[in-house]
Amino acid sequence: MLILNGFSSATLALITPPSLPKGGKALSQSGPDGLASITLPLPISAERGFAPALALHYSSGGGNGPFGVGWSCATMSIARSTSHGVPQYNDSDEFLGPDGEVLVQTLSTGDAPNPVTCFAYGDVSFPQSYTVTRYQPRTESSFYRLEYWVGNSNGDDFWLLHDSNGILHLLGKTAAARLSDPQAASHTAQWLVEESVTPAGEHIYYSYLAENGDNVDLNGNEAGRDRSAMRYLSKVQYGNATPAADLYLWTSATPAVQWLFTLVFDYGERGVDPQVPPAFTAQNSWLARQDPFSLYNYGFEIRLHRLCRQVLMFHHFPDELGEADTLVSRLLLEYDENPILTQLCAARTLAYEGDGYRRAPVNNIMPPPPPPPMMGGNSSRPKSKWAIVEESKQIQALRYYSAQGYSVINKYLRGDDYPETQAKETLLSRDYLSTNEPSDEEFKNAMSVYINDIAEGLSSLPETDHRVVYRGLKLDKPALSDVLKEYTTIGNIIIDKAFMSTSPDKAWINDTILNIYLEKGHKGRILGDVAHFKGEAEMLFPPNTKLKIESIVNCGSQDFASQLSKLRLSDDATADTNRIKRIINMRVLNS
């Protein structure tokens, strides 16, 4: 994405190896430039090791942009340099590579002339010939190869980047991924990454939206502007179901591919109510921000009217999940908006379990750290407020489980497919493993110790006098027909092999509501301050909890409305109660 934060063009998006940002947030102290920075990860699902490396980055020296002042989410790009003034859009211009380094043409030799004319790439033939010029960074550090392709018939231009790890990146292949002068389409200022492919045939496809006049008051100082230059990152699709060696964009401007994962950047086209999961398809036109602004770095106006309101992670496994587009996580962005300057004031995450259990929002942006003690040894804040509390390894394990380890651990315990690489990284980062290539026995033992620590941390929490808890499940899926049968047979004893998350506060709406009765001495514990998602008052039970099914009340039966009225439902209950198909009354067995 175009960085619009007031930096020079030499600080454009940096190319980074494909990897997922680590969980949580990283707040750094001021460096030699005196700037403070923070990084917030996006809700990106792992996919065989090849997933988009994107995150929200803040710098105290940044300007305004689609994420408010100081914030940016940069994708790979190549741009014309503006260090010597406005580009001339001819051979005299300098190009800046993805790492901000000036690019120079490689030498032309008899064995390797530069430029050359190409009619094909591998087995793919083109309807026109291209003049291909090879470039390299003036100061070599990344050891990638760059090619600038210009069509000899229509003049369309794009870049190919051959990375040292064998990954091929395509930048600006279509007009949607080029930042150009609306009055002169050949005056391209930036080429944005549009597709990447690995040697194994794994693809990532980036989609962009062009600025327009939707929801903008076109009177006054907005009258007569051509605002179509700006490009906003809209979707990142990856996890192609069928491997393909060649770039999809060689043959199609909009690849018709079965993608398994989609990261959606929403600019107000969908609702932002935390209680209502947004749909995959946009419902409305995007919203206009209160503080529109323009950039003129490249000799034409780049007008911005949008703010990214949320980032959504969807999975596409219709056979396994029972629906074409399944929301699994979202990052809600909240702004302090005014006509002068917009600031990001909160970022809240919502996670959606595979069984339909929704985790409540949590504020990801934390208060600033305390100031350092003054020279005299006194602090301007009471020391007790910032005291460091020593925690046992078991409580630390439980806290990490609550924040982001729950999905991997529970899939492992249930015997489901789980991201093994992510599990190893978790064990390594928390000192349960000493190598990232453990033997099967070492990995199994480390997981056993880690799970035992979580369970011990849970059992160390105080008992409660709660007698009823709730859990919402999504069981009306073809893949879960056997599970549904188990849960709808009176007298059955269900053994949950994983940690079981419930709430004594509210029943989160789904097709099945578990109304669970507790007896004195049960092993469930309220996580309280240990919980990462504190808004949901979570009671967690250890693995192998036994539940006996006592009765089932189906929708449409005589007692359904009466029992439904007695349940404490989530805040969006009035809109969603028609989704409830059954209430299952269960009892936790203590032995």
UniProtKB/Swiss-Prot annotation:
EC class name: transferase
One term of GO molecular function: nucleotidyltransferase activity
Reaction catalyzed: L-arginyl-[protein] + NAD(+) = N(omega)-(ADP-D-ribosyl)-L-arginyl-[protein] + nicotinamide + H(+)
Primary site of residence: secreted
Top-level taxonomic group: Bacteria
Keyword Cell membrane: no
UniProt-annotated location(s): Secreted
InterPro entries per record: ADP-ribosyltransferase (IPR003540), Sal_SpvB (IPR003284)
Active site per the UniProt annotation: R471, S501, E538
Pfam families assigned: ADPrib_exo_Tox, SpvB
Domain TR mART core: 373-576
GO cellular component: cytoplasm; extracellular region
Keywords: Glycosyltransferase, NAD, NADP, Nucleotide-binding, Nucleotidyltransferase, Plasmid, Secreted, Toxin, Transferase, Virulence
UniProt keyword annotation of Nucleotide-binding present: yes
PROSITE patterns: TR_MART (PS51996)
EC number in record: 2.4.2.31
Miscellaneous section: In Salmonella spp. the spv gene cluster is encoded on a highly transmissible plasmid.
Function: Mono-ADP-ribosylates eukaryotic muscle and non-muscle actin on 'Arg-177'. ADP-ribosylation prevents the polymerization of G-actin to F-actin, causing actin filament depolymerization, destruction of the cytoskeleton and cytotoxicity. Does not possess NAD(+)-glycohydrolase activity, unlike most mART enzymes.
Protein family per UniProt: Belongs to the SpvB family.
Record-given protein name: Mono(ADP-ribosyl)transferase SpvB
